[in-house]
Amino acid sequence: MSEELSAATSYTEDDFYCPVCQEVLKTPVRTAACQHVFCRKCFLTAMRESGIHCPLCRGSVTRRERACPERALDLENIMRRFSGSCRCCSKKIKFYRMRHHYKSCKKYQDEYGVSSVIPNFKISQDSVRSSNRSETSASDNTETYQEDTSSSGHPTFKCPLCQESNFTRQRLLDHCNSNHLFQIVPVTCPICVSLPWGDPSQITRNFVSHLNQRHQFDYGEFVNLQLDEETQYQTAVEESFQVNM
């Protein structure tokens, strides 16, 4: 961090990073009792999963905080005024713009996994089926990590960090945040590999950070992964037409 920021405030650069997702804070919120700061989304997710404790120190959190945490507006203002270095390319960026910078920083994307922009569908239903039957190294890699579906109908995956299996996307995310938060080992993301646009050769250097950034929702809830691009487009047009009638 610049000397100007260190002299002007009592904050260090680490204070601008969320202890849950390990990324620059997005809509920071602060706990009343222990004064720890998190991304709002990370905090609410932790409250939904773990209940009444601070995700960092296990301190108490009130019922009101769990539903509506207090914004850390002082920290937001400082993030708008001062800059820090991109962890990959070292370019100086205002802290509040850092996440936007990551979307165009090739070094960051090479380090932490797939691009934040999902490519257009270019795989037809037939080619997906054919690919699933193929005995290439790519399909072997997919089978290594993706398993059967759970009783809820969601696909399940094997954790590449400990090989424990039968995790849904959400359970894998929770498991890794609880057990592997500070374990940084180059692995292949099993969720990415399972998607039509997944690249089995893509290595993710910080798997837990990658999960928190890229896999906060199930893609299957928003798109039919078995349909090709043209069918997806036509479906979206028809649904939009129905909504606006």
Curated annotation (Swiss-Prot):
Major localization class: nucleus
Keywords: Chromosome, DNA damage, DNA repair, DNA-binding, Metal-binding, Phosphoprotein, Repeat, Transferase, Ubl conjugation, Ubl conjugation pathway, Wnt signaling pathway, Zinc, Zinc-finger
UniProt keyword Ubl conjugation, yes or no: yes
Ranges of residues in domain UIM: 225-243
Posttranslational mods: Auto-ubiquitinated.
MF-aspect GO terms: protein kinase binding; single-stranded DNA binding; ubiquitin protein ligase activity; zinc ion binding
Pathway: Protein modification; protein ubiquitination
Zinc finger (C2H2-type): 157-180, 187-215
Record note on domains: The zinc finger domains (C2H2-type and C2HC-type zinc fingers) bind DNA and mediate recruitment to double-strand break sites. They show strong preference for DNA with 5'- or 3'-single-stranded overhangs, while they do not bind blunt-ended double-stranded DNA or poly(ADP-ribose) (PAR) polymers.
Protein name: E3 ubiquitin-protein ligase RNF138
UniProt organism field: Mus musculus
